[in-house]
Amino acid sequence: MSNAPILLTPGPLTTSIRTRQAMLVDWGSWDRDFNQLTASVCEQLLAIIDGASSHHCVPLQGSGTFAVEAAIGTLVPRDGKVLVLINGAYGQRLAKICKVLGRTYSTFETAEDQPTTAADVDRLLAEDPAITHVALIHCETSTGILNPLPEIAQVIKRHGKRLIIDAMSSFGALPIDAREIPFEALIAASGKCLEGVPGMGFVFAEKSALAAAEGNAHSLAMDLHDQHAYMAKTGQWRFTPPTHVVAALHEALQQYNEEGGLPARHQRYADNCKTLLDGMAAIGLRSFLPAEIQAPIIVTFHAPTDARYQFKDFYERVKAKGFILYPGKLTQVETFRVGCIGVVGADGMQAAVNAVAEVLREMEVLDI
C-alpha cells in the first residue's frame, strides 16, 4: 500500500492505515455490537452540526446520490414543488432526480463561476408561491464553488419554505450549525471530508418533517421514514448494511475528533488549498474561480493551451509520480481538478505541485 498513489480527488480519497485496518473485522449485521457501532456513528455525525435536538440522522447504503434521491423522494410530498439552484453538474443532477421521481420542479441556473445569491432566491420565491422546497448544493464539486448557504437559508425560512442541502463535499470541513441554519434535510456521505471510505450516505432530517413523511417515498429501499422507524424500533438496518464501511467511518470519526474536529479539519484543508493555489500559480496554471468563492475542497484549473497538452497523457504521467488528479467537469472551457481533501497535508500538496511541474516540462508544454 505504500506505493499507492495519493488521491487528489473529491472522493473516494486517500484514507489512513487505521481506517483501512478497521475494515479487517467482519460484523454480524444484526449483532448488538454492530448496532451500537451504527448508533455511535449517527450520534457523532449529529454532533458535528449540533443537530441532536432538531434532526434525526438516517444512514443509507450506497453513494451520496442514493441519499440525495432518498431525501427528495421521502421529504418532498408528491404534490410539492422544488426550486433547484444550479451552478454546476451536481445541481443539474438534483433537477434530474426531481424529474425521474415525478416531483414538480423549477430551476434557476447561474454560470459555473457565479454563486447563487440570497437576492436571487428571494425574488424566485416571491414570484412562485407554489414552491414548497429549495434544493441547494453547498459546495458544487464540479468547480469547487461555495454557495452562500447561511444567507440563502434565512431567505427560505422567511418565505416559509423548506431547504434541502446537498453538503456532500462540505460536511465535516465547512461549518454548518443546525441551530443557526434552518434546513429540513442535509445530505452527506462517508467518503468525503470525514475521510472514510465510500458506500454509505446519511441524511439529517428534521424530526417533525420526517415524522410527517410516511407514504411519500417512491421506493421501499430509499424510504427514509421507514428506515428511521425501523432503526428506532430495533437498532438495526432494514436491509443488509455496508458493515465494513460503517466500521471504517467509526474509526475515521475517532481520528477526526483526535485531530480537533471541524476547525482542525478545515484548517488543514485550507492550508492544502493555499499551498496548491500558490504552487500552481508559480507554474503559470490559473484557477477557474476567484479566491473569495473557492472552497478549500477541490480546485479547478484551466488546462494549458499548448497543443502538446493532452489530459490523458498528463494524467498518466502525474499518476506515475504518485498522484491521481481529476478531469474537469465544465461545459465551456477545458479544465482539470485537484482535490485538497483526504489524508494529505501541505507537504503532500507541494509534492503534487512539483510533480505537475515536472510533467509539464517532460511534455514540453510551454504555452500555459
Curated annotation (Swiss-Prot):
EC numbers: 2.6.1.37
Family per record: Belongs to the class-V pyridoxal-phosphate-dependent aminotransferase family. PhnW subfamily.
Protein task: Involved in phosphonate degradation.
Name this polypeptide is given: 2-aminoethylphosphonate--pyruvate transaminase
Organism: Pseudomonas putida (strain ATCC 47054 / DSM 6125 / CFBP 8728 / NCIMB 11950 / KT2440)
Necessary cofactors: pyridoxal 5'-phosphate
Lineage of origin: Bacteria, Pseudomonadati, Pseudomonadota, Gammaproteobacteria, Pseudomonadales
Name of encoding gene: phnW
Record key words, sorted: Aminotransferase, Pyridoxal phosphate, Pyruvate, Transferase
Catalytic activity as recorded in UniProt: (2-aminoethyl)phosphonate + pyruvate = phosphonoacetaldehyde + L-alanine
Pfam families noted in UniProt: Aminotran_5
Subunit comment: Homodimer.
InterPro entries for this protein: Aminotrans_V_dom, NH2EtPonate_pyrv_transaminase, PyrdxlP-dep_Trfase, PyrdxlP-dep_Trfase_major, PyrdxlP-dep_Trfase_small, SP_NH2Trfase/AEP_transaminase
Gene3D superfamilies, per database record: Aspartate Aminotransferase, domain 1, Type I PLP-dependent aspartate aminotransferase-like (Major domain)
A molecular-function term among this protein's GO annotations: 2-aminoethylphosphonate-pyruvate transaminase activity
Biological processes annotated in GO: organic phosphonate catabolic process
Positions bearing N6-(pyridoxal phosphate)lysine: 192
